[in-house]
Design a protein with these regions (language model features):
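Active-site nucleotide/adenylate-binding loops and adjacent lid/helix of ATP-dependent enzymes
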Residues: 1-174, 179-197, 203-241
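Conserved protein-kinase catalytic-loop segment immediately C-terminal to the catalytic Asp
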Residues: 179, 261-262
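A short local loop/turn or secondary-structure capping micro-motif enriched for an aromatic residue
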Residues: 195-200, 276-280
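C-terminal active-site "lid" helix and adjoining low-complexity regulatory extension at the edge
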Residues: 230-241, 249-254, 262-336
Length: 336
């Protein structure tokens, strides 16, 4: 009931702050990822801009989208044009802090001058769409899809592989879901993001399997499955190795999933979430999996500058500890 309420109740300042506590939201983990990724050359991150949505605007996501007036939508569009410094000649990938609606790719891939001018409407709709999953009328009811007060605009990464598309336009790239323990600095699991068993069941054996879209996606996936899996097997160990090399600089706590997209010879880290909230977590041995601690009590949050300063302070402590250990080792050798 509590988690459902976060998604469907009208907002007040306290609820707004509680929603901002969600560790799965990109504004929590991206600053830590940006610091860790500086220490390697293998992975990239798409250029990303995140905003905290003003409470009065965010309340619109809890109103019926179909009843919003053209004037309201125009105000949202103009706000996003300014807030994100949009360029109508560019292509964008958009999401809330936790949800992109990528399974209908037309909702999150914004391109062309007219669509970019209406980008605010796209964000408003996908946020509304995700919150509706927590409605008591939704079957099944899913909470947490968009428990966030953030909106995100990212650069769109053009396809280098001429890959076929599923989900109404999404290029079918090889993707890797890597599970890590930030406390022990270990990779505890890795799995193909597009699991063949899951995907073929989704497209070919659910209630809407006879729809043209699902039939198309089933055929495309079967046709491209061998290519996806061959590329996954060829690169999984490499991806795992480079993730492991980053972990000492990753100053998050707990267990997380890290999603890596391959585009040609380029590898992008595109998403993260708490491991216990992630699909495919069954690839992690049960004896290694730990429950995630939840804290929904708001406090004074650190801004990004404070987070970076805090992380740099910890990194300096780690470096100082390593120097001391080396010096102690030399002293022991001299004594012996």
């Amino acid at each position: 009931m509590f988690r459902q309420g976060l998604d469907i109740l009208d907002l007040d300042p306290i609820l707004y702050d509680i929603i901002g506590m969600n560790r799965n939201s990109i504004g929590h983990w991206l600053p830590f990822l940006c610091e860790a990724i500086k220490h390697q050359q293998f992975f990239s991150i798409p250029k990303t801009k995140i905003i905290k949505v003003p409470i009065t605007l965010l309340q619109l996501t809890r109103c019926a989208y179909s009843e919003l007036t053209p004037t309201t939508l125009d105000i949202v569009d103009r706000f996003c044009q300014k807030a994100f410094s949009l360029d109508v000649s560019k292509e964008y990938f958009i999401k809330t802090g936790t949800y992109s609606s990528k399974y209908d790719f037309r909702n999150c891939y914004v391109h062309g001058a007219e669509e970019v001018k209406e980008l605010g409407e796209y964000l408003l709709f996908i946020h509304f769409q995700a919150l509706q999953m927590a409605s008591p009328l939704s079957k099944p009811m899913i909470v947490g899809a968009s428990t966030t007060n953030e909106w995100v605009v990212r650069e769109f990464i053009p396809d280098k592989e001429n890959a076929p598309t599923i989900y109404k336009g999404m290029p079918l790239h090889t993707e890797y879901r890597v599970f890590v323990d930030m406390d022990t600095k270990q990779v505890i699991g890795i799995h193909p993001y597009w699991d063949p068993v899951v995907m073929k069941h989704r497209f070919g054996h659910e209630a809407d399997a006879d729809s043209p879209h699902q039939t198309h996606d089933y055929i495309i996936f079967r046709m491209y499955e061998d290519t996806l899996m061959a590329r996954y097997k060829e690169n999984a160990d490499k991806v795992k190795k480079h993730i492991e090399e980053m972990l000492p600089y990753f100053l998050l706590e707990g267990q997380w999933s890290i999603d890596v997209m391959q585009n040609g010879d380029d590898f992008y880290i595109i998403d993260m979430a708490l491991a216990t909230n992630s699909a495919l977590v069954e690839c992690v041995p049960k004896n290694l999996l730990k429950p995630a601690k939840e804290n929904w009590i708001p406090g004074k949050p650190m801004n990004n500058k404070e987070k970076v300063a805090f992380m740099n302070e910890i990194l300096k402590e780690i470096e100082d500890d390593e120097k001391r250990r080396k010096e102690n080792g030399k002293n022991i050798q001299r004594t012996i």
